[in-house]
Amino acid sequence: MPKYLFKVKLTPDGLKGLLKEGGSARRDVVGRMVEGLGGRVETMYWAFGEDDVYVTAELPGNTSAAALGMVVSAAGGVRTSTVVLLSAEEVDEAVRHQVDYRAPGA
């Protein structure tokens, strides 16, 4: 199953909700949501810095990942950015592809 990294930034409303509910409750909500899409949360970490939460999850495909990001962001508590993750074996497969390319100006 494809793996994704969701980078999450809390909005002021999202931060208020976090302060009210706590991190464990939000982790449980995320787990149920991902499982409802046929996936599984691998990790969920709160962080300092540009992003507030990092979630790695397996999902059935890009449309599931897109649906998750759209619905969660539309609710207004967070803004998400989704990164498709590749395993070492997927990179091995990618480098075996023949790609016809010419750099600009070459």
Whereabouts are the PLM-identified features?
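A compositional/biophysical signature of low hydrophobicity enriched in polar/charged and small residues
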Residues: 1-106
